[in-house]
Amino acid sequence: MAVYEERIPQVKQQRPRRRGNRKLVFLLVLFFLTILIIVFIRSPYSKVQEIRVTGNDIYTTEQVITESGLMKDMQFLNVWENSVRNNLKPLEAIKDVTVSRSFPGLITLHITEQKRVAFWSGQDGSRYALLDNGYVLKQVNFAKRVVDRPLISSWASPELLPHLAKSLSKLSPNVLAEISDITLTPTVYDKQRITLYMRDGNEVRSVIYKLDKMMNWYPAIMKQLPPDTKGVLSLFEQPWFIPYGAQGAIPIQEGQEQPQQPQQ
């Protein structure tokens, strides 16, 4: 009998299938995941709780937030950068905006604006920013804000403003801050002659197309003059300085110091 039992092939035991268990686990996970999503959507953590704005100078934080279309208590996950960018297009001085999200509920708008290089003074007392692209921004009246840029007055040729803006944008911040007023003083031979009134009491006479190359030398030139000397500095081909009330000019030597570089 033992011999016959050895010849009979033994039937392998089949393992029970687990498809039913896997399907049950999947349904349970899906169920609880759905519950978690519903709970999150209805919780305060799914809402926008705070909106911050950085990089804005021309527009106020309230203006940017209002124009962006963002509001508190809106869905946190329903904030799209392209939508915000399109909403901010009416604010003409904004070059770009990026949106960052920080959990829970914080939205930050990072604003990049055109640079203010001067102020355009209107006849009615209004004051508008001249941007580095040559555009006079009339959306915002700066009449009640601190004058931290040159004030343009007596300017009869608006077509020259883009050229002036380009030159001013290349000046270092320190030199730009020293300029108080700019007037257009053309001659028969040169329509781009300008006069700059400095905050230290001096006058500078130059031309628009040389301003960005010559004006950054201003701090170095002033160091060559006797202390407390005020007068007229001419920045053309060869700079020279005439004190107020004097007949002769003080020679100016170029190249003794490096000009101040514009901020990138």
Curated annotation (Swiss-Prot):
One of its GO terms (cellular component) is plasma membrane. Residues 1-23 are cytoplasmic. The keyword Calcium does not apply. It is a single-pass type II membrane protein. GO terms for biological process: FtsZ-dependent cytokinesis. Residues 46-114 form the POTRA domain. PROSITE patterns: POTRA (PS51779). The chain crosses the membrane at residues 24-44. Residues 45-264 are extracellular. Its main location: membrane. It comes from the Bacteria. It holds the Pfam family POTRA_1. Keywords: Cell cycle, Cell division, Cell membrane, Membrane, Transmembrane, Transmembrane helix. It is found in: Cell membrane. Cell division protein that may be involved in stabilizing or promoting the assembly of the division complex. Belongs to the FtsQ/DivIB family. DivIB subfamily. This is Cell division protein DivIB.
